[in-house]
Amino acid sequence: MSQMIRPPIVLLKEGTDTSQGLPQLISNINACCAIVDTVRTTLGPRGMDKLIYQSERQVTISNDGATVMKLLDIVHPAARTLVDIAKSQDSEVGDGTTSVVILAGEFLKAAKPFLEEGIHPQIIIRAFRSACELAKQKIQELSVDIKPENMREFLEKCASTSMNSKLIASHKQFFSKMVVDAVQLLDDNIDLDMIGIKKESGGGLGDSQFIAGAAFKRTFFYAGFEQQPKHIKNPKVLCLNIELELKAEKDNAEIRISDPTKYQSLVNAEWKLFFDKLEAIHASGVNVVLSKLAIGDLATQFFADKNMFCAGRVPDDDIRRVCRATGAAIQNTTSNIIPDVIGTCDLFEEVQVGGQRYNLFTGCTMTQTATIILRGGGEQFIDEAERSLHDSIMIVRRARKHRSVVAGGGAIEMEVSKYLRDYSLSIEGKKQLLINAFAKALEVIPRQIADNAGFDSTDILNQLRQKHAQGEKWFGVDIVNEGICDTYESAIWEPSLVKLNSIVAATEATCLILSVDETVQNNQAEQAQAGPQINNQTRQALSRGRGVQAMRGRG
């Protein structure tokens, strides 16, 4: 009896590409390591910047890990995991975005030889998670609680440390005080929306200003604006979301009249409605009127005659910050303006900053707010300074809440690495080797800081290992003297939350990538979305497990 040939079982649509097994896992690791190499040189006080060219008018210069990862527009599905953890670190803590990406890449690189030797990924995952828990416990044990009387100094040092690797590092003392002033003005909830950062080209970084209140750039104005008061004590502020302007209706406007003489009565009625709105605003007793929509020339002249200030087309975030700071509420009508919706503060004034005029509300009683006006030469430079200040504000915010600190400069990573190495000697089997590999991977932070500063990283690491073996737990890389030093005594401090979050996020990303053993790629879906296509040569390289490494040197 002849053997029947069974037809193959088709589970996926034609054109669907699948890659699975160890080669696919190694390919994902190679892709992630290639991404890590892109941001590796941005770490530390001597880290380099990246110039990302998107279009003729959109150029970004940054060494912020989250910004660089976001602008790279990575399409590899496994490598996008690193983008996600960088964004998570940025939103959760504000700093350490480059560190978390480098740590994840180093953990994957440490796992690669074990995979090639045939160790199951789940064994590696369990060992790495165990090492992560031990690292968390050690960091919490080493962290130093800050006393309330030293809180100001502590916050300034944390802000200064986060600026060490930024373009504004030369002005870190100036900006660290500014950042701490801004955060300490806020209430215990520390809502970052109450800190506004404005950018004004011209001058230098040292010309930047801190304002203990809400401020926004003067909006477009009409004739009569120059006659309005620009300095008002204890102002009464009304915020609107209506248009105070007479405009000629061109679309969807139709009037049907039987008698041409009635046309003037319609015009008079329109003017009466308009002036009724203005009179209602004046009758409410306010003397500062802000609106998200336009305030026309007629309304501007009316308010000037009544000795009132007005500003139209105020940006949404600015008018909301003014409302929260002064206690005002945005109104969509002028028919029912009650005292409860009117805000106040100690002083309203208009001041000159560079080539622009700014409207300032200071002495706000309802909710404290702050505004930082950044000055600088180039647009890209000011944008990077804004990102740097955002990171520093996030760090100070977290430090104020958690009030525990560890030494920076790679000191905490070296101490945790030593602890894990000692612990691995007390256990047996594969777990010992895996925890030891995890410990060695942590040393990438001080090693990369030294490399980026142009030091001999091998010599630096040997010195650090010797010091930590002698019980000097706070020794890290000394950028100033090209060696090592006690970074805690040198006031190079970082909130312990930054280090905890970095190691946990990097470990989870590593475990996620190690747990994926198959990739299914639907080419038809890609064509429908007009996404990037993968040619046959690239697909063959990925299926053989060589990934990105296989394509190097072919460009």
UniProtKB/Swiss-Prot annotation:
SUPFAM superfamilies attached to this UniProt entry: GroEL apical domain-like (SSF52029), GroEL equatorial domain-like (SSF48592), GroEL-intermediate domain like (SSF54849)
GO biological process, alphabetically ordered: protein folding
Entry keywords, A to Z: ATP-binding, Chaperone, Cytoplasm, Nucleotide-binding
Subcellular location as annotated: Cytoplasm
Keyword tRNA processing among record annotations: no
Coiled coil residues, start to end: none
Keyword Cytoplasm in record: yes
Pfam families: Cpn60_TCP1
A molecular function GO annotation: ATP binding
Role according to the record: Molecular chaperone; assists the folding of proteins upon ATP hydrolysis. Known to play a role, in vitro, in the folding of actin and tubulin.
Family of the protein in this entry: Belongs to the TCP-1 chaperonin family.
Subunit structure: Heterooligomeric complex of about 850 to 900 kDa that forms two stacked rings, 12 to 16 nm in diameter.
Name recorded for this polypeptide: T-complex protein 1 subunit eta
Species name: Dictyostelium discoideum (Social amoeba)
